[in-house]
Amino acid sequence: MKSSNNTRNLKIGDIYLVHFDGSGNEQKGFRPGLVFQNNVGNEHSPNLIVLPLTSALKKTNQPTHVFIPKEVGLRKDSMVLCENPKCMSKDKLGEYITTLPEEYMAQVAVGNILSSSAIAFIDPDLLMSVWQKALALNAIAN
């Protein structure tokens, strides 16, 4: 891929063709990937967090798998594998495919939270503060 990816205006929710270097049961090869890093990180880091998509619709009842219909701009009906986040260089990004609508991003966020269950360690009284910080990290910088 091209190093010009470091200058792209990447946003959480964007789907790109991505080269995954998986081994074993990990996703590998070129496939769609969902940018799942906050926008401040996307702007300043040479790396980003991506969730792989697959068109092999298996284990559809798993709470960490989110169905995405092809009508959002994909070639095939797909699933986001929320339990498989990958940190990778922006150089592994290929062409832009589409941006996931917010209704699906909400489902992906829940799937990702459930994949680690880390939310169980947060005091419920702090959840609003965490949510506000997340909103700030996704604000579009001008």
Cite the ranges covered by each PLM segment.
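Compact nucleic-acid interaction/catalytic patches
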Residues: E26-F30, V35-K70
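Short, charged beta-turn/beta-strand-edge "cap" motif at the junction between a beta-strand
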Residues: D21-G24
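C-terminal terminal-subdomain/extension
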Residues: K2-R8, V72-N142
